[in-house]
Structures are given as structure tokens and as C-alpha cells.
Amino acid sequence: MSVVGDSAPLATLWNLTWNGDRLACVVYRGADGRMQLRVESDDAVVIDERFELQPRMLARAQALREALKRRGWEDVPTTI
């Protein structure tokens, strides 16, 4: 996954995998201070929208994750 433009990643909300494909939901902060929520594959940005740290936005990201998991996507194990 790549950083687009002058944005810096703040947090990864989730990582999913299915048949060798990966998706990540990442919050970025741009040079202007605004936050962006991106769902990214290894090759492309699938969703890119403004993000405000509000329960509604976090619930939307969680609902997308749950919908993908119902369709066969699995959590990527985290290593520390």
C-alpha cells in the first residue's frame, strides 16, 4: 500500500485478506491537517473520503469490515 500525495498514515483500522488479495482501512492526515479514510488494496485506493473522528464514521468503517467478512474476507493476523 502506498501513501498518496503528501499524506501520512495515522492509524490502520483493519486489514483483511481473501484469496491472496488484501484490503486495509487506513486513516491518513494530509499536509492541510485534514484526515482521510482510505480503503486500499496493494494496487489501488478503493475508497477515499474525508474522515472526522466521530462515532458515525467509525461505525461506517466497522460496518464495511463486517460486510466484507460475511462475504469471505478474513482478518490478517497481526504480528508484534
What function would you assign to each model-found segment?
Residues 1-10, 19, 77-80:
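Intrinsically disordered, low-complexity and often Lys/Arg-enriched segments
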Residues 7, 11, 64-67:
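Intrinsically disordered, low-complexity regions enriched in Ser/Pro/Gly/Gln/His and often acidic
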Residues 8-24, 31:
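N-terminal acidic leader/helix
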Residues 23, 67-80:
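Short, mixed-charge low-complexity intrinsically disordered segments
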Residues 23, 27-46, 78:
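Short aromatic-glycine-(Arg/Gly/Cys) micro-motifs in beta-strand/loop hairpins
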Residues 43-56:
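A short, exposed loop/beta-hairpin motif centered on an aromatic-Gly-Thr core
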Residues 53-70:
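A short, charged, amphipathic alpha-helix used as a generic interaction element across diverse proteins
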